[in-house]
Structures are given as C-alpha cells and as structure tokens.
Amino acid sequence: MTSDQAKKTFVLKGIGVSPGVVIGKVYRFDPLDAQISFYKLNNSDLIPREIERFKNALKESTRQLQTIQENLKKTKVTEPLYIIDVHILLLSDKKFINRTIKYIQRLGVNAEWALRMTLDHYKQIFEGLDDAYISGRISDVQYVVQRILRNLSGEKHEVVWDVGMGGVVIVSHDLSPADTAQMKLEKVVGFATDSGGRTSHTAIVARSMELPAVVGLDNVTRFVRTG
C-alpha cells in the first residue's frame, strides 16, 4: 500500500472460493503483463515465417506446461494435472490453430493479432451460453492465449516459485491453474485476484491445495504493492 492508503482501513468484497483466514505481506504477481505488438505484414512473403513463429510458440507453450506437470507429479498436488491436460489439448486443437493461421493468411496480420482475434471469436461463443460452468471455461482459453503471446514476445513467463519471501498473500489481476499449482505452500498463505469465479479451474486448484483464496475483487491490484 502507499503511505496514504496505509493510514486507513478499507474493505473489498469478492468471492471466497477456498476457505480460511490469513494475514501476510502482499506479493504482486503479474504473469500476463507481456508487451504485445499488433501490426499488418507489409509483404506477403512474410506470412510463412509468421505462421512458423506461431507454431514455434505453440510448441514452447506445450513444453512449458508439460514441465509443470512433471514437477507437480513429484508433489502431493495432483488435482491440477487434468486441468493442465486441458490446456495442453487446446494447444493442439486443430480448429484453434487453423483459425489463427487463417487470420494470418487472409488478413496479413502478425501472429499476435491473429491470436487475439481467435480469442475474441471464442469469447463470443462462450459468452452466449447459459451454463455458468461451461461459459466460465473461456478463462482456460485466455490462459493458453496469454502463454502463447508471452512466448511470441520472447518475454520470460514469471512463475510463483520466484517468490523470495515467506508468509505472503499473492495479489494478481488473474491467476491460471498452472500458476496456482506452482505456489509453494511454505511461502504462500493465500491469494486474491481482480477477476475469477467460484467455478473456475483456478478455484478448484486452490480448494484442492487448501489454499485460502478470494477472487472477483475487481480492483484489488490498484490498492496494493509488494511488501
């Protein structure tokens, strides 16, 4: 908090998705803060190279998630394994891949722009569904897209095990199931996010780890900083 905010107490209302009461120092976690560029390709000869960039980012994203799975198998945290499987399957989904490639080819845009359009397409489909659980699965598509975008940008994907201090509450705009599953329980006592819901895969992982969590706080990241 800033010095001004520290002088007063304020209450934020969210959705408790995993029970418990904790007190700890804040650790701001921004895993999705990649700098993304959207641009048109000025030469059709660049299209094959752009498609190759996209495919390489898919491969790297798959490799990263498989590594996370292997690390989790060495622990007692098994619930996230099937959820990460879902993300890996999406990375090889032909409709997802072909739609993105089609945008690159037909519109002459870079892979990042094409990927964002693919995400928008899926958002329209999921948001029109009445079932809250199924419509909430758009978050899984978003997590996968963000990982691909970060790999396209060449930026390192920040991981929760980078937390140096102990007894911290992770505060983030959002957390993927993979991010949550990698939290070291001897260092992290709970987490709070701006977005998210009770039926999200991240919430399921938190409950399986018995990690106190509140999501859907809208703007908690505006009020706090690490420490």
Sequence positions of predicted segments:
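Non-catalytic, soluble scaffold/interaction modules
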Residues: 1-227
